[in-house]
């Protein structure tokens, strides 16, 4: 699947496009890309976006320091607070040498701080140029993980309710099954068909971003575009009906959603109190206690024509950027660290086995994450992956 999953994501990245103007700072940095600054003088400060992989990055950083002697500091922003944290950290004298943007919209705010990676070994390891964001000829950022999301489900509970995955081929089927489970929840020993759709900061991104991607994707697809200044809202009624299903066939009263958290949803799913849980491949470590053979994944159906051929949502919102205001030694240390992460046995094993990542680099290891195996099967079966178009959303306030 590496090839299949990466191809699906490439479509999403290409659809979002990039800016066309180049900056003096990024152009000037290309010469320094080949510099051989002494490692002993350099250090790395990574401002990580993904809280669920914080410990994995801490461990990998410690291993790199043990092997090379180069100090690597990893700081992880709180969920939903990355942009605010980045703005604050970049004002400091010891600013991050490595940070992230979520795509073209995020890059627009930070491109003047992005070192040109076009001459770097890291860029040379990419399996496709589609995974790089550019500003003119300068490579400003590089995607480092390809992820997939949908509706994770408990096979045992679905079977106990009298259904199998083949019974759910669209929104109407999903609603029929969920409504039935909700009506029989006491009999089945669950609290609801779906886990709570918590709207606090640890969980709301699943719905205001990932779920909202579906109507945007279908509007872009219908109009043959990759971005727009303003959506028409063609599929907002479809968005509403899947959201309504999430909150009516839920483990909790809709009045409680504002206070429900991501941890609540995980506890409900792992505790076998809900059959369905919207999340992605990155959530495997949270749900693995159910057993690999007990995990399934459905597309997020919203009731559009032809959705029986729809697959899962595949793409990236994680792009590495190297801070061009850092010292030459720190820039080189950061480039060396990234190259080690995506080429060494230690780095690629950690990203595949511990973080559960599919990475778009030549030496990537096949992931043991069963949710990724499921995602690959959808592609192998000819299902159409849904591109990640939410990176074109203008801001958190817009959401």
Give the positions of each predicted feature.
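Extracytoplasmic/periplasmic solute-binding protein
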Residues: 140-144, 149, 175-228, 274
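A structural signal for short loop-to-beta-strand junctions that line the ligand-binding cleft
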Residues: 89, 96-97, 123-158, 192, ...
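Conserved N-terminal structural module of periplasmic/extracytoplasmic solute-binding proteins
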Residues: 3-12, 16-19, 23-106, 119, ...
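Glycine-centered hinge/linker elements that transmit conformational signals in sensory
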Residues: 178-179, 225-259
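Short, solvent-exposed loop/beta-turn-alpha elements that line the ligand-binding surface or hinge
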Residues: 116-130, 193-194, 198-201, 216-241, ...
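Hinge/lid segment of periplasmic solute-binding proteins
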Residues: 33, 102-153, 206, 296-298
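Extracytoplasmic/periplasmic substrate-recognition and gating elements
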Residues: 62, 66-67, 71, 160-161, ...
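C-terminal capping/gating helix-and-loop segments adjacent to ligand/active sites or protein-protein/ligand interfaces
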Residues: 143, 314, 356-363, 373-399
């Amino acid at each position: 699947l590496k090839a299949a999953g990466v191809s699906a994501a490439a479509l999403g990245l290409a659809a979002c496009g990039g800016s066309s103007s180049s900056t003096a700072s990024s152009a000037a940095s290309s010469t320094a890309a080949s510099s051989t600054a002494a490692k002993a003088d350099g250090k790395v400060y990574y401002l990580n976006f993904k809280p669920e992989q914080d410990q994995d990055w801490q461990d990998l950083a410690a291993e790199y320091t043990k092997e090379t002697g180069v100090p690597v500091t990893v700081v992880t922003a709180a969920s939903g607070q990355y942009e605010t944290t980045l703005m604050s950290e970049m004002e400091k004298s010891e600013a991050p040498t490595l940070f992230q943007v979520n795509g073209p919209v995020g890059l627009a705010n930070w491109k003047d701080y992005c070192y040109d990676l076009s001459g770097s070994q890291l860029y040379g390891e990419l399996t496709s140029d589609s995974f790089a964001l550019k500003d003119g000829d300068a490579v400003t950022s590089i995607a480092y993980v390809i992820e997939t999301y949908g509706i994770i489900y408990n096979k045992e509970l679905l079977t106990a309710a009298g259904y199998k995955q083949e019974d759910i081929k669209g929104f109407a089927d999903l609603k029929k099954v969920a409504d039935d489970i909700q009506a029989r929840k006491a009999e089945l020993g669950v609290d609801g068909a779906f886990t709570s759709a918590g709207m606090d900061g640890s969980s709301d991104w699943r719905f205001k971003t990932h779920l909202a991607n579906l109507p945007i994707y279908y509007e872009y697809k219908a109009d043959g575009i990759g971005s727009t200044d303003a959506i028409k809202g063609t599929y907002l009624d479809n968005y509403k009906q899947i959201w309504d299903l999430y909150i009516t066939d839920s483990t909790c009263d809709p009045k409680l959603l504002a206070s429900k958290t991501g941890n609540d949803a995980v506890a409900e799913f792992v505790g076998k109190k809900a059959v369905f849980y919207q999340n992605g491949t990155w959530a495997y470590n949270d749900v693995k206690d159910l057993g690999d053979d007990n995990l399934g994944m459905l597309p997020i159906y919203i009731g559009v024509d032809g959705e029986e051929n729809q697959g899962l949502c595949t793409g990236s919102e994680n792009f590495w950027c190297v801070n061009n205001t850092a010292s030459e030694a720190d820039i080189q240390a950061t480039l060396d660290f990234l190259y080690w992460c995506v080429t060494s046995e230690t780095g690629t094993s950690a990203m595949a086995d511990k973080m559960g990542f599919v990475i778009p680099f030549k030496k990537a290891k096949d992931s043991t994450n069963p949710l990724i195996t499921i995602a690959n099967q959808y592609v192998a079966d000819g299902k159409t992956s849904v591109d990640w178009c939410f990176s074109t959303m203008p801001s958190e306030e817009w959401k």
